[in-house]
């Protein structure tokens, strides 16, 4: 990624100009926690999206994909939290359609300009009575400062809300990108429930905006794993409404590259926040791989290591077991010469040219304990570096350790 010319600003999702958001309690969750999020652009916005590749998809996924088929404009995103509306048959589809139509009518916009998302328990339909009464309440709560409330309303088993906003100078004006995300379990996206909604006030051509988002997702959300399970509801929506009044970006070039780099930075921040918030996790794991023939191969190895249950368990046990890292690298489906393999854990070099090195095991274990006790998303990252040869490919993936609490949380999820 190019050198950052942007800076982080407050406001999250609604930091970009021309966006409002709300997060309310509509009664969809039995807990009484916020459960309905609404994001609205004051003007037509170019919409891009990436969806789950699961063959079992929620109604909201197929419906929103259909909404964007041949249409690149969206004005609103509605997300309910509590029921996934997946594996709910024809009635689930009808509920998704009605959700969009109800919102469009209330906002007085075309229904094809509404995208919908759901998260919660698979097999449960949306509580439509609560949704019908919640939509006007959410509209009434819309605010240019509503980003944090929307970030809270999309959560399920998450422990913390996930949001960010960045600002980039372009000439005598600035462009902003904001985003929110949710995800804690069932996280192994390929585009958990993993949802992310991104706003931008740049003017970008539809094809270029979609290409930017797809590449950003490949380098962020598609590089995280908590438990290896891909959700039925995964989606990323990105709206760009042009309200920054900067010149339209219609083709690749230095300005487009800067915007894409900032979009990728937003996605990577949110992706890492999801991985760190993995159910029962005590630390974030970052796996850096280099030396492959290309970047895709490096990303594949990194993701395999980050997703290895044995690696994750070793990190939770504060065990610097490099053998598990090497084994995971070897089964990633990427060819390399094991005699070139090198592994580092933090500052400790464990393996060089395929041969183990002496290291202070107690100090390495203490490094893992210190990361588990570190400040959230600051000093809590376990760094694993893997070198497989002389190639120029590089890749990064993120995950978390696997604790007893992960099993407890998921064993008791619906009981």
Curated annotation (Swiss-Prot):
Gene Ontology CC entries for this record: cytoplasm
Instruction: Write down the species.
Output: Synechococcus sp. (strain ATCC 27144 / PCC 6301 / SAUG 1402/1)
Entry annotation: catalytic residues? 193
Known SUPFAM superfamilies for this protein?
Answer: DmpA/ArgJ-like (SSF56266)
Q: Which Pfam families match?
A: ArgJ (PF01960)
Q: Copy the pathway line from the protein's UniProt record.
A: Amino-acid biosynthesis; L-arginine biosynthesis; L-ornithine and N-acetyl-L-glutamate from L-glutamate and N(2)-acetyl-L-ornithine (cyclic): step 1/1; Amino-acid biosynthesis; L-arginine biosynthesis; N(2)-acetyl-L-ornithine from L-glutamate: step 1/4
According to UniProt, where does the site described as Cleavage lie? Answer: 192-193
The record's function comment reads:
Catalyzes two activities which are involved in the cyclic version of arginine biosynthesis: the synthesis of N-acetylglutamate from glutamate and acetyl-CoA as the acetyl donor, and of ornithine by transacetylation between N(2)-acetylornithine and glutamate.
The EC code for this enzyme is 2.3.1.35, 2.3.1.1
Q: What is this protein called?
A: Arginine biosynthesis bifunctional protein ArgJ
Alphabetized PANTHER family for the sequence: ARGININE BIOSYNTHESIS BIFUNCTIONAL PROTEIN ARGJ, ARGININE BIOSYNTHESIS BIFUNCTIONAL PROTEIN ARGJ, MITOCHONDRIAL
Q: How does it assemble?
A: Heterotetramer of two alpha and two beta chains.
């Amino acid at each position: 990624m190019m050198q950052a010319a942007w800076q982080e600003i407050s406001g999250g999702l609604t930091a970009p100009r021309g966006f409002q958001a709300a997060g309310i309690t509509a009664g969809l969750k039995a807990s009484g926690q916020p459960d309905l999020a609404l994001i609205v652009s004051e003007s037509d916005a170019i919409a891009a999206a990436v969806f789950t590749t699961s063959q079992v998809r929620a109604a909201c996924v197929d419906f929103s994909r259909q909404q964007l088929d041949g249409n690149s404009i969206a004005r609103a995103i509605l997300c309910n939290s509590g029921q996934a509306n997946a594996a709910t048959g024809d009635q689930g589809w009808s509920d998704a359609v009605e959700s969009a139509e109800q919102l469009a009518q209330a906002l007085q916009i075309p229904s094809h300009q509404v995208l919908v998302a759901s998260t919660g328990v698979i097999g449960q339909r949306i509580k439509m009575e609560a949704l019908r009464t919640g939509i006007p309440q959410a509209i009434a709560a819309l605010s240019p400062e509503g980003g944090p409330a929307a970030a809270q309303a999309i959560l399920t088993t998450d422990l913390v809300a996930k949001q960010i906003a960045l600002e980039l100078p372009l000439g005598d004006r600035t462009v902003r990108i904001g985003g929110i995300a949710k995800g804690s379990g069932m996280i192994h996206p390929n585009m958990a429930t993993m949802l992310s909604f991104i706003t931008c006030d740049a003017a970008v051509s539809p094809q270029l905006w979609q290409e930017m988002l797809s590449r950003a997702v490949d380098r962020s959300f598609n590089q995280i794993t908590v438990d290896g399970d891909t959700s039925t509801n995964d989606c990323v929506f990105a709206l760009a409404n042009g309200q920054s009044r900067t010149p339209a970006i219609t083709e690749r070039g230095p300005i487009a590259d800067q915007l894409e780099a900032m979009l990728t930075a937003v996605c990577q921040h949110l992706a890492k926040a999801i991985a760190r918030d993995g159910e029962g996790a005590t630390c974030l794991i970052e796996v850096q791989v280099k030396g492959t023939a290309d970047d895709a191969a490096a990303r594949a190895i990194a993701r395999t290591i980050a997703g290895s249950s044995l690696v994750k368990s070793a990190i939770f046990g504060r065990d610097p077991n490099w053998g598990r890292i090497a084994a995971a690298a070897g089964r990633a489906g990427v060819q390399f010469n094991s005699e070139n393999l090198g592994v580092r854990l933090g500052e400790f070099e464990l393996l060089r040219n395929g041969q183990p090195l002496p290291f202070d095991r107690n100090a390495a274990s203490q490094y893992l304990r210190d990361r588990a006790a570190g400040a959230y998303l600051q000093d809590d990252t376990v760094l694993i570096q893997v070198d497989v040869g002389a190639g120029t490919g590089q890749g990064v993936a993120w995950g978390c350790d696997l604790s007893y609490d992960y099993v407890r949380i998921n064993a008791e999820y619906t009981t």
